[in-house]
Amino acid sequence: MSNTRLTLFFTNIFQLLDSKIQNYSINFPIKILLLLLGFFIATVLATVFGQTGDWDVLVAGILVAMIEILGNKMYSKKYISKKQVFDISFLSLIGINYIKIGLIFGLFVDAFKLGS
């Protein structure tokens, strides 16, 4: 195959996509497990505390505060500047962030279930 600009362009695009896919596939099963754990926690919280109706506002306030504090920690300059692959505190923050994403998604889906 000749090395035209078009073939070089597509070769570079495919190499970039391959490197991105391999980068995201690291610990993929653990990430999915943490997302599902967050989804399960959201379902449990909505079911248990939603039965009485008295605790809804308090639990929602605690969850929003927890999500905001975690987001502040996750995206602060301290952690962004020293993203090291083997830093235990950063890896645990990433894991908790995946649980947080699952929690938000679970509450979002539960709100749609209640609305229909």
From Swiss-Prot:
Keywords: Chloroplast, Plastid. It is found in: Plastid, Chloroplast. InterPro entries: Uncharacterised_Ycf20. GO terms for cellular component: chloroplast. Belongs to the ycf20 family. This is Uncharacterized protein ycf20. It comes from Mesostigma viride (Green alga).
